[in-house]
Amino acid sequence: MLIPLQLSAQSDEQLMLRAARGSDRAFEELYNRHARRLQGFFVRRLDDDADLAADFMHDTFLRLYAAREKYHEGNSFRAWLYTIAYNLCKNHHRNQLSIVHDDEKDMPTEADIEVELDTNILHDALREVLKSIPEPYAMLFSLHYEEELTIPQIAQITDLPEGTVKSRLYKTMNIIKQQLKQYENR
């Protein structure tokens, strides 16, 4: 007689397969593992709006739950989860663009330029820089360096070729380096 593994000992992919077969406990375990980090992802992508981030996090899991039967063995759970999250952010920012003109969005505001940052708090400086670069580039940076997704996973999530993901990450890093040097010189 085989004894099933404790849920906490199973991989995300194993849990998602169980959830696809109707196990609410397996889905709850996935939620417990990923909700906090996913909400942090949304907070960073939604200008520190914690309430909106919580709504987006819950919406992501609701969509994941509704589509759980479509999950196939061999797929990366995290890539699927962040595909949903990425698309929610992309749609949100697309809706925001109807309010703000593209050229205004791509340029940092005077307030962003004049913000005085303590050079000892690199994290805060980085977050400010990320707010001033175009959203698609900031999103790629966040997926790779903050959420620790691989280039192939990001390519799958964003529906971009791997080479494009790499070149945009390289360009983003150069922009970040240049802007952080400006903060250093203040």
What residue ranges belong to the model's regions?
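Short helix-capping/turn signature of helix-turn-helix
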Residues: 33-36, 45-46, 142-149
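Arg/Lys-rich amphipathic alpha helix in sigma70-family domain 2
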Residues: 66-73, 83-103, 119, 171, ...
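Helix-turn-helix DNA-binding module
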Residues: 128-139, 147-164
